[in-house]
Amino acid sequence: MIKAVIFDLGRVLVHFDFSLGYRQLEPLCGIPADEIPLRVAESRLAIRLESGELAPREFARELGQLLGFEISFEEFCRIWCSVFTKPTLIPEALVEAIGKTHRLVLLSNTNSIHFEMLWENYPILRHFHACVLSHEVRAMKPNPQIYQAAIEAAGYAPEECFFTDDIAEYVAGAKAMGLDAVQFQSASQIEAELRSRGVI
């Protein structure tokens, strides 16, 4: 029996499109927006931020040096957070209903810049009983360490926890830890999966 439901954040609860931020950085650094993510990936700066190795201000400074722009930290955060769009991908009412009968845990590869903004602007997150965030755990999916942290936050055995994520590799990592995991495709699909398990 499922006693806890664990949700990924990006592209499961909320939609994001990094190109929205890259297009704002393009005129500041003179690098084409479609080339910026390649440079960011090669630098591993975002991974270092989301794994807790880099503090937000260090990340902003090093990214500015990498790409060649100089703006205030506040302006950088505004641009970096502009990648998220509303509405939520899963209805808040569904998440709220689940939270009344089951332990709700958020499990996300994220950073404090994004999460602080999301927490303030997306009330859906307030229904979660626990948040397991990569920059706090200092481990990113599919590292077993972060799944173990989520299992502990849920407070139940792995097989009693349902998990959904949009990335197949992360679903596989969860299954390897014993979680009942399904790749997210749509709200209706996840609702059906939860209904079939007696969660809703």
Task: Give, region by region, the residue ranges found by the protein language model.
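N-terminal alpha-helical segment
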Residues: 18, 41-42, 56, 76, ...
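Generic structural signal for small/hydrophobic residues in well-ordered secondary structure
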Residues: 8-11, 52, 98, 106, ...
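Asp-based, Mg2+/Mn2+-dependent phosphohydrolase catalytic module
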Residues: 1-3, 7, 111-112, 116-200
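Short, acidic loop-to-helix structural element flanking the phosphoryl-transfer center
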Residues: 74-105, 116, 144
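Alpha-helical elements of Rossmann-like donor-binding domains used by nucleotide-donor carbohydrate transfer enzymes
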Residues: 20, 24, 44, 58, ...
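Structured helix-beta-strand junction loops
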Residues: 8, 43, 100-101, 127
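Active-site neighborhood of HAD-like aspartate-dependent phosphohydrolases
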Residues: 1-41, 176
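Metal-dependent phosphoesterase signature
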Residues: 45, 49-89
